[in-house]
Amino acid sequence: MPAKTIEEKLKELGYELPILPSSKGIYKRCLVDGNHLYVSGHISVNTDGSSITGKLGKELNEEQGKAAARQCGLAILSSLKAELGDLGKVKRVMKLLGMVNATAEYEKHPIVINGCSELFVQLWGEDSGKGVRSAVGMGSLPGNVAVEIEAMFEIY
């Protein structure tokens, strides 16, 4: 029996790739350099493309933050699919930079970004789905979004 594709795993997990909002700046969503693919920061969006907003430690709790980070991961996957045509061309996750819109007192940024990291491990497994990572707090993010994540992947 052949291994499940990433798209099949997403469907099995009940996830749907979101519609990406239009870019607000002058940049590329993805840039391929050899066997590396760099992904610009992706904001927390619902499946319909609307933003998930709010500040952790004020309007949003830890679970809502994790869900927002997972949605960032799904948005990143939307861009990967648009760039590569097939998520099976991703060999492994190399790096994530997770930025959390949080109050000065909030301290659980890594737990929030786990929402994205857990998704990628579910899809690619422990070895290929887990890369190096930073999780930092921000005083604000564009449009008051809850989370923004940028990523780097190794591709085939």
Where does each model-flagged region fall?
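Short, polar/acidic, helix-capping and beta-turn segments at strand->helix junctions
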Residues: 1-156
